Curated annotation (Swiss-Prot):
Entry keyword annotation includes DNA-binding: yes
Gene Ontology cellular-component terms listed: nucleus
Domain bHLH: 147-196
GO biological process: regulation of DNA-templated transcription
Protein name: Transcription factor bHLH61
Protein backbone atom coordinates (compact mmCIF):
# COMPACT_ATOMS: atom_id res chain seq x y z
CA UNK A 1 0.00 0.00 0.00
CA UNK A 2 2.81 2.40 0.74
CA UNK A 3 4.34 1.79 -2.64
CA UNK A 4 1.04 2.55 -4.35
CA UNK A 5 0.70 5.79 -2.40
CA UNK A 6 4.21 6.88 -3.33
CA UNK A 7 3.48 6.19 -6.98
CA UNK A 8 0.29 8.25 -6.79
CA UNK A 9 2.20 11.14 -5.21
CA UNK A 10 4.84 11.01 -7.92
CA UNK A 11 2.12 11.13 -10.58
CA UNK A 12 0.59 14.16 -8.86
CA UNK A 13 3.98 15.85 -8.77
CA UNK A 14 4.46 15.19 -12.47
CA UNK A 15 1.06 16.66 -13.22
CA UNK A 16 1.89 19.73 -11.19
CA UNK A 17 5.15 20.12 -13.07
CA UNK A 18 3.17 20.07 -16.29
CA UNK A 19 0.86 22.69 -14.92
CA UNK A 20 3.84 24.79 -13.87
CA UNK A 21 5.09 24.68 -17.38
CA UNK A 22 1.74 26.07 -18.47
CA UNK A 23 2.14 28.96 -16.05
CA UNK A 24 5.50 29.75 -17.55
CA UNK A 25 3.86 30.03 -20.90
CA UNK A 26 1.32 32.48 -19.48
CA UNK A 27 4.11 34.60 -17.95
CA UNK A 28 5.33 35.45 -21.38
CA UNK A 29 2.26 37.67 -21.84
CA UNK A 30 2.63 39.36 -18.43
CA UNK A 31 5.19 42.11 -17.58
CA UNK A 32 8.43 41.09 -15.89
CA UNK A 33 7.44 42.61 -12.58
CA UNK A 34 4.45 40.23 -12.33
CA UNK A 35 6.12 36.85 -13.17
CA UNK A 36 4.76 33.80 -11.46
CA UNK A 37 7.41 31.52 -9.98
CA UNK A 38 6.57 27.98 -10.66
CA UNK A 39 9.20 26.87 -8.14
CA UNK A 40 6.78 27.65 -5.35
CA UNK A 41 4.71 24.71 -6.40
CA UNK A 42 7.81 22.47 -6.34
CA UNK A 43 8.71 23.67 -2.87
CA UNK A 44 5.22 22.88 -1.69
CA UNK A 45 5.49 19.41 -3.15
CA UNK A 46 8.88 18.81 -1.57
CA UNK A 47 7.57 19.86 1.80
CA UNK A 48 4.59 17.61 1.25
CA UNK A 49 6.93 14.70 0.70
CA UNK A 50 8.78 15.41 3.92
CA UNK A 51 5.61 15.18 6.05
CA UNK A 52 5.78 12.17 8.35
CA UNK A 53 2.90 9.81 8.01
CA UNK A 54 2.06 7.04 10.41
CA UNK A 55 3.42 3.63 9.56
CA UNK A 56 0.08 2.03 9.89
CA UNK A 57 -0.89 -0.04 6.95
CA UNK A 58 -4.58 0.41 7.41
CA UNK A 59 -6.46 2.17 4.65
CA UNK A 60 -8.72 3.94 7.11
CA UNK A 61 -5.78 5.73 8.74
CA UNK A 62 -4.57 6.92 5.38
CA UNK A 63 -7.98 8.18 4.41
CA UNK A 64 -8.53 9.87 7.77
CA UNK A 65 -5.40 11.96 7.40
CA UNK A 66 -6.10 15.55 6.29
CA UNK A 67 -4.82 16.71 2.94
CA UNK A 68 -1.27 18.02 3.26
CA UNK A 69 -1.75 21.19 1.24
CA UNK A 70 -4.46 22.52 3.56
CA UNK A 71 -2.19 22.33 6.65
CA UNK A 72 0.82 24.10 5.22
CA UNK A 73 1.89 27.15 7.22
CA UNK A 74 1.71 30.48 5.49
CA UNK A 75 4.83 31.13 3.50
CA UNK A 76 6.84 34.23 4.25
CA UNK A 77 6.63 36.94 1.74
CA UNK A 78 9.38 36.68 -0.79
CA UNK A 79 10.55 39.29 -3.23
CA UNK A 80 9.07 37.18 -5.96
CA UNK A 81 5.53 37.73 -4.62
CA UNK A 82 5.92 41.41 -3.90
CA UNK A 83 3.94 43.54 -6.36
CA UNK A 84 5.69 46.50 -7.92
CA UNK A 85 4.73 49.96 -6.66
CA UNK A 86 1.90 51.64 -8.50
CA UNK A 87 2.90 54.52 -10.69
CA UNK A 88 1.00 57.80 -10.38
CA UNK A 89 0.20 60.35 -13.01
CA UNK A 90 2.82 62.73 -11.63
CA UNK A 91 5.63 60.31 -12.51
CA UNK A 92 5.07 61.37 -16.10
CA UNK A 93 5.71 65.09 -16.71
CA UNK A 94 3.74 65.29 -19.93
CA UNK A 95 0.52 64.25 -18.10
CA UNK A 96 1.01 67.06 -15.57
CA UNK A 97 1.44 69.56 -18.42
CA UNK A 98 -1.79 68.40 -20.01
CA UNK A 99 -3.70 68.70 -16.71
CA UNK A 100 -2.47 72.23 -15.92
CA UNK A 101 -2.77 73.53 -19.49
CA UNK A 102 -5.85 75.31 -20.80
CA UNK A 103 -6.87 72.36 -22.79
CA UNK A 104 -10.44 72.38 -24.02
CA UNK A 105 -12.11 69.03 -24.55
CA UNK A 106 -13.04 68.11 -28.09
CA UNK A 107 -16.59 68.83 -29.19
CA UNK A 108 -19.07 66.13 -28.44
CA UNK A 109 -20.36 64.59 -31.64
CA UNK A 110 -23.89 63.39 -31.21
CA UNK A 111 -25.44 60.78 -33.46
CA UNK A 112 -27.99 61.81 -36.01
CA UNK A 113 -30.82 60.38 -33.90
CA UNK A 114 -29.94 62.75 -30.99
CA UNK A 115 -29.31 65.81 -33.19
CA UNK A 116 -32.74 65.69 -34.73
CA UNK A 117 -34.73 65.08 -31.60
CA UNK A 118 -37.22 67.77 -32.61
CA UNK A 119 -38.00 66.02 -35.91
CA UNK A 120 -40.65 63.44 -35.30
CA UNK A 121 -40.87 60.54 -37.64
CA UNK A 122 -44.27 59.41 -38.96
CA UNK A 123 -43.95 56.19 -37.00
CA UNK A 124 -43.57 58.16 -33.76
CA UNK A 125 -46.62 60.29 -34.68
CA UNK A 126 -48.67 57.18 -35.39
CA UNK A 127 -47.59 55.63 -32.11
CA UNK A 128 -48.55 58.84 -30.28
CA UNK A 129 -51.93 58.86 -32.00
CA UNK A 130 -52.51 55.27 -30.96
CA UNK A 131 -51.49 56.15 -27.41
CA UNK A 132 -53.83 59.16 -27.36
CA UNK A 133 -56.72 57.06 -28.69
CA UNK A 134 -56.07 54.48 -26.02
CA UNK A 135 -56.00 57.18 -23.35
CA UNK A 136 -59.31 58.67 -24.56
CA UNK A 137 -60.93 55.24 -24.56
CA UNK A 138 -59.68 54.70 -21.03
CA UNK A 139 -61.06 58.08 -19.97
CA UNK A 140 -64.46 57.27 -21.46
CA UNK A 141 -64.55 53.93 -19.73
CA UNK A 142 -63.52 55.60 -16.48
CA UNK A 143 -66.32 58.16 -16.85
CA UNK A 144 -68.86 55.41 -17.40
CA UNK A 145 -67.53 53.55 -14.42
CA UNK A 146 -67.74 56.68 -12.27
CA UNK A 147 -71.50 56.83 -12.86
CA UNK A 148 -71.82 59.65 -15.40
CA UNK A 149 -75.03 59.58 -17.50
CA UNK A 150 -74.98 58.38 -21.08
CA UNK A 151 -75.86 60.39 -24.20
CA UNK A 152 -79.33 58.86 -24.52
CA UNK A 153 -80.17 59.74 -20.94
CA UNK A 154 -79.02 63.34 -21.40
CA UNK A 155 -81.07 63.68 -24.62
CA UNK A 156 -84.16 62.37 -22.84
CA UNK A 157 -83.67 64.89 -20.04
CA UNK A 158 -83.38 67.76 -22.54
CA UNK A 159 -86.56 66.62 -24.33
CA UNK A 160 -88.52 66.52 -21.09
CA UNK A 161 -87.25 69.94 -20.10
CA UNK A 162 -88.40 71.45 -23.44
CA UNK A 163 -91.82 69.80 -23.05
CA UNK A 164 -92.24 71.15 -19.52
CA UNK A 165 -91.25 74.66 -20.62
CA UNK A 166 -93.83 74.64 -23.42
CA UNK A 167 -96.54 73.34 -21.11
CA UNK A 168 -95.80 76.11 -18.60
CA UNK A 169 -96.00 78.70 -21.40
CA UNK A 170 -99.33 77.29 -22.59
CA UNK A 171 -100.65 77.31 -19.04
CA UNK A 172 -99.77 81.01 -18.70
CA UNK A 173 -101.67 81.89 -21.93
CA UNK A 174 -104.90 79.96 -21.31
CA UNK A 175 -107.09 81.95 -18.86
CA UNK A 176 -109.02 78.97 -17.45
CA UNK A 177 -107.02 76.02 -16.12
CA UNK A 178 -108.87 73.33 -14.18
CA UNK A 179 -105.91 71.16 -13.12
CA UNK A 180 -102.12 71.35 -13.33
CA UNK A 181 -101.44 68.01 -15.03
CA UNK A 182 -100.56 67.74 -18.72
CA UNK A 183 -103.89 66.27 -19.85
CA UNK A 184 -105.92 69.02 -18.18
CA UNK A 185 -103.68 71.78 -19.58
CA UNK A 186 -104.03 70.46 -23.13
CA UNK A 187 -107.81 69.98 -22.79
CA UNK A 188 -108.33 73.52 -21.44
CA UNK A 189 -106.20 74.95 -24.25
CA UNK A 190 -108.31 73.11 -26.87
CA UNK A 191 -111.56 74.40 -25.35
CA UNK A 192 -110.21 77.95 -25.31
CA UNK A 193 -109.24 77.71 -28.99
CA UNK A 194 -112.75 76.49 -29.90
CA UNK A 195 -114.27 79.42 -28.03
CA UNK A 196 -112.08 81.89 -29.91
CA UNK A 197 -113.01 80.33 -33.26
CA UNK A 198 -116.73 80.66 -32.45
CA UNK A 199 -116.29 84.35 -31.67
CA UNK A 200 -114.46 84.92 -34.95
CA UNK A 201 -117.20 83.22 -36.96
CA UNK A 202 -119.90 85.27 -35.24
CA UNK A 203 -118.09 88.54 -35.94
CA UNK A 204 -117.69 87.61 -39.60
CA UNK A 205 -121.43 86.95 -39.92
CA UNK A 206 -122.27 90.31 -38.33
CA UNK A 207 -119.91 92.04 -40.69
CA UNK A 208 -121.57 90.44 -43.71
CA UNK A 209 -125.02 91.58 -42.53
CA UNK A 210 -123.84 95.15 -42.11
CA UNK A 211 -121.86 95.14 -45.33
CA UNK A 212 -124.80 96.26 -47.53
CA UNK A 213 -125.53 99.33 -45.40
CA UNK A 214 -121.93 100.31 -44.75
CA UNK A 215 -121.55 102.46 -47.89
CA UNK A 216 -124.70 104.45 -47.18
CA UNK A 217 -123.72 105.00 -43.57
CA UNK A 218 -120.30 106.31 -44.57
CA UNK A 219 -121.85 108.81 -46.99
CA UNK A 220 -124.22 110.07 -44.31
CA UNK A 221 -121.49 110.49 -41.76
CA UNK A 222 -119.22 112.30 -44.21
CA UNK A 223 -121.99 114.71 -45.19
CA UNK A 224 -122.84 115.41 -41.58
CA UNK A 225 -119.22 116.05 -40.79
CA UNK A 226 -118.92 118.44 -43.72
CA UNK A 227 -122.03 120.33 -42.68
CA UNK A 228 -120.82 120.62 -39.14
CA UNK A 229 -117.37 121.82 -40.17
CA UNK A 230 -118.47 124.33 -42.88
CA UNK A 231 -119.38 127.85 -41.84
CA UNK A 232 -120.07 130.73 -44.22
CA UNK A 233 -121.70 133.78 -42.68
CA UNK A 234 -122.11 137.24 -44.24
CA UNK A 235 -123.48 140.10 -42.13
CA UNK A 236 -124.13 143.18 -44.23
CA UNK A 237 -124.79 146.56 -42.61
CA UNK A 238 -125.06 150.05 -44.03
CA UNK A 239 -121.52 150.48 -45.22
CA UNK A 240 -119.58 147.68 -43.49
CA UNK A 241 -119.83 143.94 -44.06
CA UNK A 242 -118.64 141.26 -41.58
CA UNK A 243 -117.58 137.90 -43.05
CA UNK A 244 -116.92 134.68 -41.03
CA UNK A 245 -115.63 131.57 -42.88
CA UNK A 246 -114.63 128.12 -41.46
CA UNK A 247 -113.91 125.15 -43.76
CA UNK A 248 -111.30 122.50 -44.41
CA UNK A 249 -108.09 123.97 -45.69
CA UNK A 250 -106.66 123.52 -49.15
CA UNK A 251 -103.82 125.13 -51.05
CA UNK A 252 -104.47 128.70 -52.36
CA UNK A 253 -107.70 129.19 -50.45
CA UNK A 254 -106.62 132.50 -48.87
CA UNK A 255 -105.67 134.10 -52.18
CA UNK A 256 -108.84 132.95 -53.94
CA UNK A 257 -111.03 134.23 -51.08
CA UNK A 258 -109.41 137.68 -51.11
CA UNK A 259 -109.74 137.94 -54.90
CA UNK A 260 -113.43 136.92 -54.68
CA UNK A 261 -114.12 139.66 -52.14
CA UNK A 262 -112.44 142.25 -54.35
CA UNK A 263 -114.53 141.10 -57.28
CA UNK A 264 -117.70 141.62 -55.22
CA UNK A 265 -116.64 145.24 -54.45
CA UNK A 266 -115.51 144.62 -50.87
CA UNK A 267 -112.20 145.78 -49.55
CA UNK A 268 -110.77 144.11 -46.45
CA UNK A 269 -110.23 146.55 -43.63
CA UNK A 270 -109.33 144.09 -40.85
CA UNK A 271 -108.78 140.32 -41.14
CA UNK A 272 -107.82 137.36 -38.89
CA UNK A 273 -106.78 134.13 -40.68
CA UNK A 274 -105.94 130.75 -39.12
CA UNK A 275 -104.84 127.58 -40.91
CA UNK A 276 -103.90 125.39 -37.91
CA UNK A 277 -106.44 122.58 -38.41
CA UNK A 278 -109.11 124.13 -40.63
CA UNK A 279 -109.23 127.32 -42.66
CA UNK A 280 -110.74 130.13 -40.60
CA UNK A 281 -111.24 133.75 -41.76
CA UNK A 282 -112.85 136.62 -39.93
CA UNK A 283 -112.81 139.90 -41.84
CA UNK A 284 -114.36 143.36 -41.73
CA UNK A 285 -114.92 144.90 -45.17
CA UNK A 286 -116.33 148.19 -46.49
CA UNK A 287 -118.03 148.86 -49.80
CA UNK A 288 -116.16 150.23 -52.76
CA UNK A 289 -118.00 151.84 -55.72
CA UNK A 290 -121.60 151.68 -56.85
CA UNK A 291 -121.64 147.96 -57.78
CA UNK A 292 -121.82 146.90 -54.16
CA UNK A 293 -125.48 147.97 -53.99
CA UNK A 294 -126.31 145.52 -56.68
CA UNK A 295 -124.88 142.41 -54.71
CA UNK A 296 -126.84 141.06 -51.77
CA UNK A 297 -125.46 139.23 -48.73
CA UNK A 298 -126.84 135.90 -50.01
CA UNK A 299 -125.03 136.32 -53.31
CA UNK A 300 -121.79 137.04 -51.43
CA UNK A 301 -122.25 133.86 -49.36
CA UNK A 302 -122.82 131.64 -52.41
CA UNK A 303 -119.79 133.12 -54.11
CA UNK A 304 -117.58 132.30 -51.11
CA UNK A 305 -118.97 128.71 -50.95
CA UNK A 306 -118.20 128.09 -54.60
CA UNK A 307 -114.74 129.57 -54.08
CA UNK A 308 -114.12 126.98 -51.31
CA UNK A 309 -115.02 124.21 -53.75
CA UNK A 310 -118.40 123.05 -52.46
CA UNK A 311 -120.72 124.47 -55.11
CA UNK A 312 -124.29 124.89 -54.02
CA UNK A 313 -124.54 121.76 -51.82
CA UNK A 314 -124.09 123.41 -48.45
CA UNK A 315 -126.67 126.17 -48.76
Amino acid sequence: METELTQLRKQESNNLNGVNGGFMAIDQFVPNDWNFDYLCFNNLLQEDDNIDHPSSSSLMNLISQPPPLLHQPPQPSSPLYDSPPLSSAFDYPFLEDIIHSSYSPPPLILPASQENTNNYSPLMEESKSFISIGETNKKRSNKKLEGQPSKNLMAERRRRKRLNDRLSLLRSIVPKITKMDRTSILGDAIDYMKELLDKINKLQEDEQELGSNSHLSTLITNESMVRNSLKFEVDQREVNTHIDICCPTKPGLVVSTVSTLETLGLEIEQCVISCFSDFSLQASCFEVGEQRYMVTSEATKQALIRNAGYGGRCL
